[in-house]
Amino acid sequence: MLKMANLRLEFWDKDVEDKFIALKVEAYYDIIKELLFAHLYKNGYNCTNHLCLIAYLKEKIKDFDFEIQKVDELRKVRNEISYRGLTIKKDYFERNELEFKNIIQRLKEEANSIQ
């Protein structure tokens, strides 16, 4: 899971045309989701849905409340993109990209700290 998350991050860590912003937002959610699953599996847990991942985050990662809200918001945005064809404005992405990257970094650190 960590390898796939890193591969996705490497692929999407570049500027894209505005018409691809929704795909990049989806990709950030997928990267975060894969890192969460890696964390889950390393702790011996399994999860069957995205809400379970959010609940796991709340329980297991301390001092992460704002980030958890941002991940849940991203989950909802990703669902709107995937299931309703929502288009994403560039300013949404620009306002949130740094936070997405910070969440990814923290999740990588958390996953790597598990023995």
Model-identified regions with their sequence ranges:
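Terminal alpha-helical segments
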Residues: 1-115
